[in-house]
């Protein structure tokens, strides 16, 4: 997946970035380099390879320090929402920012 200068301009616009021509060119090169790496990784056959939860588990035995998933804090949503400018049905209301 190769990006074009138009793609970089669009991404910069969406990210509210003002890039010079030189910066756009450098960004295009960096992004295309990233996507090249992703494509090479996709090409690797990983059939039969178990996923690692940590890279260390490939070279040594790793004991996971798991704990019970238990609630340790009390629900303070209502107290936290008292200072919010707008709340509805327990949700924070924010202004629309998508054009």
Swiss-Prot record:
It is an enzyme of class 6 (ligase). Gene3D superfamilies: Glu-tRNAGln amidotransferase C subunit, N-terminal domain. The keyword Nucleotide-binding applies. Keywords: ATP-binding, Ligase, Nucleotide-binding, Protein biosynthesis. Pfam families: GatC. The keyword Metal-binding does not apply. GO terms for biological process: glutaminyl-tRNAGln biosynthesis via transamidation; regulation of translational fidelity; translation. Its EC number is 6.3.5.-. It catalyses: L-glutamyl-tRNA(Gln) + L-glutamine + ATP + H2O = L-glutaminyl-tRNA(Gln) + L-glutamate + ADP + phosphate + H(+); L-aspartyl-tRNA(Asn) + L-glutamine + ATP + H2O = L-asparaginyl-tRNA(Asn) + L-glutamate + ADP + phosphate + 2 H(+). GO terms for molecular function: asparaginyl-tRNA synthase (glutamine-hydrolyzing) activity; ATP binding; glutaminyl-tRNA synthase (glutamine-hydrolyzing) activity. InterPro entries: Asp/Glu-ADT_sf_sub_c (IPR036113), GatC (IPR003837). It comes from the Bacteria. Allows the formation of correctly charged Asn-tRNA(Asn) or Gln-tRNA(Gln) through the transamidation of misacylated Asp-tRNA(Asn) or Glu-tRNA(Gln) in organisms which lack either or both of asparaginyl-tRNA or glutaminyl-tRNA synthetases. The reaction takes place in the presence of glutamine and ATP through an activated phospho-Asp-tRNA(Asn) or phospho-Glu-tRNA(Gln). Heterotrimer of A, B and C subunits. Belongs to the GatC family. PANTHER family: GLUTAMYL-TRNA(GLN) AMIDOTRANSFERASE SUBUNIT C, MITOCHONDRIAL. This is Aspartyl/glutamyl-tRNA(Asn/Gln) amidotransferase subunit C. The gene is gatC.
